[in-house]
């Protein structure tokens, strides 16, 4: 149910947040630039009008999502810091200071699930609109990177131990009979599995791994016998069987029990041979530096990500503005999609090209490398490095929120730098005026 609008009439005894805050602060400016009414109109139809408990204001929830990725903090931290920060409260639509927390951290989870990927895409679209004409660049760079999932490094031993723990929990929850719990056996096996890289312990550890897999299979079969075929745990049992039956050379393996959609991606990095998560595509304007596209995939070939990424960019911009898209050598394939030309580095053997055209392309290829540190900023500053959201939907939500936070941060830095530039100019003018006054006084003093 939608909440009623609060009475914003100011008490005569207290100042409102608008009067207390610095109106040149970037957060204050951003709060007045964002079109909050657009979010109200888009998300209000997702609520019941006359039934249920009144929900939290839509502006509050959208503002908390933006602040979370803008400041790189968790759901719990953003809710806690909101009650301590006047600018956060003004950004989320409050008119007077509120000393209490605005909501429970779990309500952000429900709100993300309510608005879905289309709602998060609206936030990204608004971040592009706030950047104004900077997003109207006809040339952009495209690149893919890996968004790692919040899972441990997968090994067969870890997966089998997880299966054993899950089977025990299900049996305990449903009061099912268990022939043997294997508590002491597993404790001994875990000791044998330690220091497996030592030559003396290698064969002992492998034997312990095989025994652990056997125990996991026994518990799964016993669970299957005791449960009916149409039980709610049937999907879990099928997942356990897939993990136990998969071989080293199989494709589409499962690397996590609680995140079965995780992909193993190798980008050729020396320091990190394999990464476990999903591939994301980023489109970044070359001249102005605005992210105009951020889309999640599984693990396709880079060239196959261009068309869906361009479709999303057209949705976000509302028009086809990209004439040239610059990629690396991994984007071999189509050279033209609709009105957009795809350019990748290659030897300049075409005699039809003039020297001017060759130099122009070389400059664009050099500019394309600027997207690499952008990927780094998205990971370290805006929570793209490790994705804590659940499932494939969580993968797509996280990358779009990170891109939106990057765009908002870009404008905040721009406003901050313009404020300091104006401040420096005023200081210089003041110093010039002081010297001019001193010079006039000296001239007047020594004049005859």
Model-identified regions with their sequence ranges:
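Charged, often Cys/His-bearing segments associated with DNA-binding zinc-finger transcription factors
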Residues: 1-34, 41, 413-448
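Short, conserved catalytic/metal-binding motifs centered on acidic residues
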Residues: 25, 64, 78-79, 104-108, ...
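Basic, short loop/linker segments at the boundary and entry of helix-turn-helix/winged-helix-like folds
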Residues: 26-66, 70
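Acidic, metal-coordinating catalytic cores used for nucleic-acid/nucleotide bond scission
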Residues: 51-56, 86, 325-334
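Active-site- or DNA-interface-adjacent structural scaffold in DNA-acting proteins
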Residues: 95-261
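Flexible, glycine/threonine-enriched loop-and-boundary segments that flank and lead into catalytic domains
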Residues: 256-272
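Electropositive, glycine- and tryptophan-enriched low-complexity nucleic-acid-binding patches
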Residues: 270-316
């Amino acid at each position: 149910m939608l909440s009623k609008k609060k009475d914003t009439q100011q008490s005569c005894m207290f100042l409102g947040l608008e009067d207390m805050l610095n109106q040149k602060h970037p957060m204050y400016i951003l709060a007045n630039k964002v079109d909050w009414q657009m979010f109200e109109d888009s998300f209000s139809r997702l609520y019941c009008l006359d039934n249920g408990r009144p929900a939290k204001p839509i502006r509050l929830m959208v503002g908390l999502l933006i602040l979370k990725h803008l400041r790189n903090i968790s759901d719990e931290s953003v809710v806690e810091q909101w009650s301590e920060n006047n600018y956060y409260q003004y950004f989320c639509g409050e008119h007077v200071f509120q000393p209490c927390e605005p909501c429970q951290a779990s309500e952000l989870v429900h709100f993300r699930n309510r608005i879905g990927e289309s709602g998060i895409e609206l936030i990204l679209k608004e971040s592009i609109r706030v950047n104004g004409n900077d997003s109207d660049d006809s040339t952009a760079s495209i690149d893919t990177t890996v968004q790692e999932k919040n899972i441990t490094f997968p090994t067969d031993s870890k997966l089998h131990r997880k299966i054993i723990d899950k089977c025990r929990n299900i049996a305990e929850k449903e009061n099912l009979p268990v022939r043997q719990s294997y508590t002491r056996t597993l404790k001994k096996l875990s000791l044998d599995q330690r220091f497996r890289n030592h030559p003396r312990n290698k064969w002992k550890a492998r034997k312990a791994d095989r025994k652990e897999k056997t125990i996991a299979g026994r518990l799964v079969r016993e669970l299957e016998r005791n449960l009916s075929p149409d039980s709610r745990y049937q999907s879990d049992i099928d997942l356990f069987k897939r993990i136990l039956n998969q071989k080293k050379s199989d494709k589409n393996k499962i690397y996590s029990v609680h995140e079965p959609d995780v992909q193993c991606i190798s980008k050729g990095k020396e320091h990190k041979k394999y990464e476990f998560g999903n591939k994301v595509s980023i489109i970044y304007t070359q001249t102005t530096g605005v992210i105009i596209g951020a889309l999640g995939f599984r693990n396709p070939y880079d060239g196959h990500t261009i068309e869906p990424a361009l479709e999303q960019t057209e949705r976000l911009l509302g028009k086809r503005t990209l004439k040239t898209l610059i990629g690396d050598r991994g984007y071999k394939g189509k050279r033209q999609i609709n009105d957009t030309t795809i350019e990748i580095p290659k030897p300049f053997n075409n005699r039809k090209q003039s020297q001017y055209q060759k130099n122009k392309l070389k400059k664009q290829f050099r500019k394309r490398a600027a997207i690499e540190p952008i990927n780094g900023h998205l990971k370290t500053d805006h929570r793209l490095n490790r994705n804590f959201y659940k499932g494939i939907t969580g993968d797509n939500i996280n990358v779009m929120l990170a891109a939106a936070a990057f765009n908002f941060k870009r404008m905040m830095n721009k406003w901050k730098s313009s404020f300091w530039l104006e401040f420096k100019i005023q200081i210089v003018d003041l110093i010039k005026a002081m010297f001019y006054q001193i010079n006039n006084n000296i001239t007047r003093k020594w004049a005859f």
